[in-house]
């Protein structure tokens, strides 16, 4: 009996132990990342040939303590390597783990290699060659703190490399992981198994090989034991011969084609067919090109299992298309697969919530570096009937009848859309708000920018369960897609939290996707993906229009200008000159592009990058019209002092008065809820203010009276 160690992905140790026991292994002991076991020669070969879950099968040679690189070298050079292989065999070393002295795995591998070749020289043999591409012998070294285990890798290439997969799609599963998913799915041998997003077919092929009694390594040509002196060819031939005989017997039983794979991509489906042919299970699997939205049950008379590894994104904010995909998938499952079991493997648990199914079992697993989850469900006949009843519900519009998701939200969004879109067309605008937290349960905003939709989630209150808030967001995205009919790649999802300083201007992506929208004759660039904001504050639309109407023949200043959209309106309104000041180079360049887009060029349009307050203190020219829309609060590193609009607005007005011409006007706005203008402070400066907030709220923002406040400030002497 030999002591061996089977490695596997973390989370699969218990499954592997069961498999090894079934294959005849003895004394199986689970440890992190694998299972220790004992086996005689035939069982050893049977495990190598039949394991579907192990990554490698290792034969430990040396176990020792390593406190220095000398300890490592001494342990290796003192081993009798001729007991394992001769000098003609090419070898390589895999080294995993570090400690305080052995800090790099490459260094560890080099010292093991040195010890082996030096041993051969010491006993008067030629140095064996190192071959990292196709070695005859693979030495595996694992260092955990001070404990070193050196093993002979009997597998050779990793055991997930079955040999049948010649090509894959964009996101392939390792075969060992696929086998584990199948085993955890609850699927029973002999019953139908369907994968509606099968990709290169790995899940179905692994399951089909189980049903066909095909050993996963049956066609492997090279093994790690081929040049091992302890290899027993007779025992190996016996075990392999038994496996071949079992596969042939099963093949002759005329098994039904109980496996069914679908995918939207016909090219990857062709690869799946070739993979199945290579794996010897092509006769068991039917393939069909198709969309999940039209998914049908091909096994109407039977009960089986749907298994799937659908696509998933690393970041929720980049996956509105996936939200729609999972939502539609869940609907089709309930409509088509009554009394079936379903098992879904995903790297984004939130997306699984879009299925709107209740799992009865779930497992955690790793797919490479990604933390993933596998959830098992049962589609009851009652759930199927409920979904059918929802389709016939008279309470919601026919555009929504494909889903029971967020009905209240969907109805409100649809009602708002009918009203606002008609008004927007009359106004000559194509960027506007459709929904703004109208319902407390759906705390988000929905904005249209031409043929794009932006869904912005507001930060949920602390007393709201995070999972519930996320589920509502996902439901709202699904409903938004259905109501608006927007293409999934033109829906942008953003998570908005309370702002701190100027972090609203932090970059989120670098796609550079700009397009322009129309606003009362002005064309304005927007970017929906790269920043938390889009480059256009929609609630200030009427303010910009008013500024344009006030600007004719005047020298105008836009302070805290952002992307200069107000400057564009004032310039188009006939301003004599414009001065645009902002601290951000990015947004100042954006402002310049906005001017150019509207054919506004010339020396009369000045763009100044500066700390606005410092620039204002130095400014020595005067203006007829000043628009100032400062942040509520800022503590930017590029500013000398912090800024608070409530605390500091009189200081700001003091400086603005200095550069305001007689009969001039200041339009002052901010977004601080509950802002109180210091009327007495203004009076002491010789200024008076009239609030015009209600007049600057457009129809699409009338439900949010406090989104901004706006004031017209003039010199008292001019009144």
Swiss-Prot record:
Which reaction(s) does the protein catalyse, per the Swiss-Prot or TrEMBL entry? guanosine(2445) in 23S rRNA + S-adenosyl-L-methionine = N(2)-methylguanosine(2445) in 23S rRNA + S-adenosyl-L-homocysteine + H(+); guanosine(2069) in 23S rRNA + S-adenosyl-L-methionine = N(2)-methylguanosine(2069) in 23S rRNA + S-adenosyl-L-homocysteine + H(+)
Q: Does the keyword DNA-binding apply?
A: no
Q: Where in the cell is it found?
A: Cytoplasm
| The enzyme's E.C. designation | 2.1.1.173, 2.1.1.264
Query: Which one of the record's GO molecular function terms can you name?
Result: rRNA (guanine-N7-)-methyltransferase activity
Give one Pfam family: UPF0020
Keyword field: Cytoplasm, Methyltransferase, RNA-binding, rRNA processing, S-adenosyl-L-methionine, Transferase
Where is each THUMP domain found?
43-154
Keyword field contains Acetylation: no
Which top-level group of life is the source organism from? Bacteria
What Gene3D superfamilies does its record include? Answer: 3.30.2130.30, RNA methyltransferase domain (HRMD) like (3.30.750.80), Vaccinia Virus protein VP39 (3.40.50.150)
Which Gene Ontology cellular-component terms appear in the entry?
cytoplasm
What the record says about family reads: Belongs to the methyltransferase superfamily. RlmKL family.
What is the stated purpose of this protein? Specifically methylates the guanine in position 2445 (m2G2445) and the guanine in position 2069 (m7G2069) of 23S rRNA.
What HAMAP family does this protein map onto?
23SrRNA_methyltr_KL (MF_01858)
Under the heading NCBIfam families, the entry gives:
PRK11783.1 (NF008748)
- The name this protein carries in UniProt is Ribosomal RNA large subunit methyltransferase K/L
Point out the gene that encodes the protein. Answer: rlmL
